[in-house]
């Protein structure tokens, strides 16, 4: 297990852990360009808003953290490799027990349909991973997270490494120096997640 103090210190310094998919070896990432969701201007797709209006999904916070992280760590049809090792899973479950890691669960007729998890420190939320089993479930979870973070006064939603999916969802990239300025401001803010 990753020592909790070391993990939290790493986040405060702009690092986050990943595991090599081939052997589970842990390494620390601090990309030169960082993906963020702009909390003040983020808008979900029309499809997500339509699903919201219809009440198709029920959304919860921290109702089943372990199920969410294990679903995120599971191999996917389009990508059988995962960067979420058993060591990462166990560490984040422990951090959740300490009240610092959180999940958003999206349920369809009571069944877990999608969700996401991450870590909250000060006014920053570090989104780690998301998954879905039904269309748009992870995007509904993301929209609820953004609304919740706005309500609580968070300043940052870190999506870490840009990819085409995050870009389609509305993430933007900022250079490392700008990211660190934003992070320092967010860490100074005292904000409860729940």
UniProtKB/Swiss-Prot annotation:
InterPro entries: Acyl_CoA_acyltransferase, Leu/Phe-tRNA_Trfase, Leu/Phe-tRNA_Trfase_C
Subcellular location: Cytoplasm
Function, as annotated: Functions in the N-end rule pathway of protein degradation where it conjugates Leu, Phe and, less efficiently, Met from aminoacyl-tRNAs to the N-termini of proteins containing an N-terminal arginine or lysine.
Entry similarity comment: Belongs to the L/F-transferase family.
NCBIfam families: aat (TIGR00667)
Keyword presence, Transferase: yes
Any GO BP: protein catabolic process
Main location: cytoplasm
GO cellular component terms attached to this protein's record: cytoplasm
Reactions listed under catalytic activity: N-terminal L-lysyl-[protein] + L-leucyl-tRNA(Leu) = N-terminal L-leucyl-L-lysyl-[protein] + tRNA(Leu) + H(+); N-terminal L-arginyl-[protein] + L-leucyl-tRNA(Leu) = N-terminal L-leucyl-L-arginyl-[protein] + tRNA(Leu) + H(+); L-phenylalanyl-tRNA(Phe) + an N-terminal L-alpha-aminoacyl-[protein] = an N-terminal L-phenylalanyl-L-alpha-aminoacyl-[protein] + tRNA(Phe)
Keywords of this entry: Acyltransferase, Cytoplasm, Transferase
Protein name: Leucyl/phenylalanyl-tRNA--protein transferase
Record-listed E.C. numbers: 2.3.2.6
Molecular-function GO terms, alphabetical: leucyl-tRNA--protein transferase activity
Signal peptide (residue range): none
Biological source species: Chlorobium luteolum (strain DSM 273 / BCRC 81028 / 2530)
